[in-house]
């Protein structure tokens, strides 16, 4: 509440001659919160509150300028010392909200194709040396969240010697081909919850953790989501659509689609291991229970993919030992 009062006082200095109502709008998985300031004439802005003792708004401001080729929120005012940023208001309707309201496959595909178009535009603008690299150390730190948080906390187990061997074999097999993929700008959380339904182009949110990394990463984030799931044939068609657009745009994807699909699936393994660990950490460390029920979806993704590739047999064996081989119940599937 103290932060909200401080934000309101700051906004009164930014808009000294305008009355406004300040209401809660949204919260992220980290410490950021968003409020909507609605003025007497009905117009509104969105205010980011990022406590400076917990995080800096500097990465957000840097990437916001870098990603100006897509429809990111415009920064109207900012105070980096206080951790406050005023943004133009892109509305309330995320792609996820729109999809849950309109559950037809045709409507979902239309939205996802819009998102893919924006992703290609973002990737076309990529330049080396601008963003931090998505390197081996980062990938390794991320996937180690799986044994550290999912296995240790969610399952309450410690890997046996044999299981540690299976895990190490997985890491040694998985990371080299991912690191060998051509690199582009990676949003890192390009999901339907972070895309806004706006007039014209989709709004793109939550980009502050962007890196320079594997070209298939953001497509995996979009099509193998935490909160909504589509049949594999539907996803396959959209991966093909992306691959065709990427080739036409001159992006560095393989000429053979089956090779690109392998990139996509293996990249998904890294992301799914990471997210399962993060969702467990959000619950056990941070007390946030919103994400924990979606962990089974990532376990299903992981089992399906690791079953398909002989090289990933150690991961499949480990998953079967830890959580069995039955499909786990999840939320929305289309």
From Swiss-Prot:
Enumerate the UniProt keywords alphabetically: ATP-binding, Carbohydrate metabolism, Cell shape, Cell wall biogenesis/degradation, Kinase, Nucleotide-binding, Peptidoglycan synthesis, Transferase
Task: Tell me where on the tree of life, at the top rank, the source sits.
Answer: Bacteria
Keyword Nucleus part of the UniProt annotation: no
Protein family per UniProt: Belongs to the kinase AmgK family.
Give the GO molecular function terms.
ATP binding; kinase activity
Quote the protein name from its UniProt record.
N-acetylmuramate/N-acetylglucosamine kinase
- What's its top-level EC category? transferase
Pathway note = Cell wall biogenesis; peptidoglycan recycling
